[in-house]
Amino acid sequence: MDRKLRIGLIVVVVLALAYPAASWVIGMSVQHQLLEREGQATERLPYLAVVKRDYRRGVYSSTEEVTFGVSASVLKSLQAAGQDWGQQAQFTVRNHIHHGPLPQLRAFAPATIDTEFVLPPEAQQKLLAMIGDQAHLSIHTEMKWAGGSTTLVHSTPVKKDTPGQGGFDWRGLDVKSELGRAVGTQATEGTAPGLIVTSSQGNVSIEDLKVSTDVHQAFDELTIGKGRFSLGHLAIDAPTPVFKLDSRNLTLQVDSSVTGDFVNSGGALSMDSLEVPQFAATQLVWEVRMDHLHGPSLASLTKELRDAQAAQVRAALQSGPNDAAALAQQQLQTTQKIVTAFQTYGLQILAHDPIIEMPHIGFKTPDGDLMLSLKLEAPGLTPADVSGDPKALVAVLPQHLQATVNARIDSALLEKLLGQILPDSDKSNPVKARLQQAQDQGYIKVDGKALTTQVTFMGGQLKINGLPFAPLMAPPPPPPQAPPGKKPAPRKRKD
């Protein structure tokens, strides 16, 4: 036999014998990674708890079934939304795992995973009755040799019409998620063309939904990075009670970063247009920033809040959803833990000069514009100020608190809003009188067709437009009116 041929045969035999062993070892590593990631997920999602896990490992493939329990608060939200199958407090995730190094001879990877959701029987029946068997959801994950994974989620479009009841048109979903080697590192892109639901109770239309994230972990507990959510069009039309909503290009953006021991974060919610009964506006925006947040304290606060909520979920699953007394006791204990966490770590954040700012809040209407801004900080507070008696903190805080509020509103818009909020002139006239009194005192300024004011609190003093604030006295009552046909009595002259 040719020497090269013999060597080739030997290599093939060695590989054939070694492949099962390699696949078995890789399967053990994959199992460890999955358990670790599931533990991290439940830590970051305190509204879920693992009820049961079954992992059946083979040489070339494995199957994992994980049953999660849902918190009582989530169930109440489902019930409020009319989903009576929300009584089911559990759902199961089933993973079909194919070990590498050549899983199913379709990839060169440690493993590939195909995931499916197993709903409770009642929920499954309702879902089938709603959408039939047309829908198909695929979740495919390919793990990486250097750590991390790539997950692709695809949902097929589904359209169903029920005569006399309505229908829906789901246009599909595509998501790609990249998990990095480092814990908490993730980048996600997702798109959903839209959903249209019609029924006798109303119609809902959602178009052009997009989601993206690029985040990593900081201080072991915090998620830092960028995120964006956008919705091209949202329309709601309900006949009873009559309600209509139409919004265009809704966008939510968040961004956070770390500098030393401090976290800087911000977010902006904006809409090109919004129309609801008695109100229509364009260029709506609400920006929020929270800067110089002490990272270690914020991480500890986040962990305590998650642990409190997770403990409540575990206790609720043990006692059952129908034990009202136990659920009430669990809620009380959770509330006490949350209060304690804020008293401890929230005050530590306050002692490191945080800054809260809303630099831009506003919108435009045919009647005029509204613009607001706000900034809060309390520089100079020390850990000693916040670690003692809360009454002492209340006493010292006004000396450090610095607050500024700027407001500008067009007069015509203010007039319209007052008319909608206080349609009764007996109630609106006193408000208008107080506004005029504030204008006369310099607390409100006229800038063209708009009214402006600036409110500041510094050094324990409240000022409006730079003037020390004195509580506005109630305007004098109007003179009494004589009955029709009768002249008012003449006033007596004083000699």
What is each PLM-predicted segment?
Residues 1-5:
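N-terminal positive-inside, membrane-proximal cytosolic segments immediately preceding the first
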Residues 6-10, 14-495:
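Glycine-rich, small/hydroxylated-residue low-complexity segments
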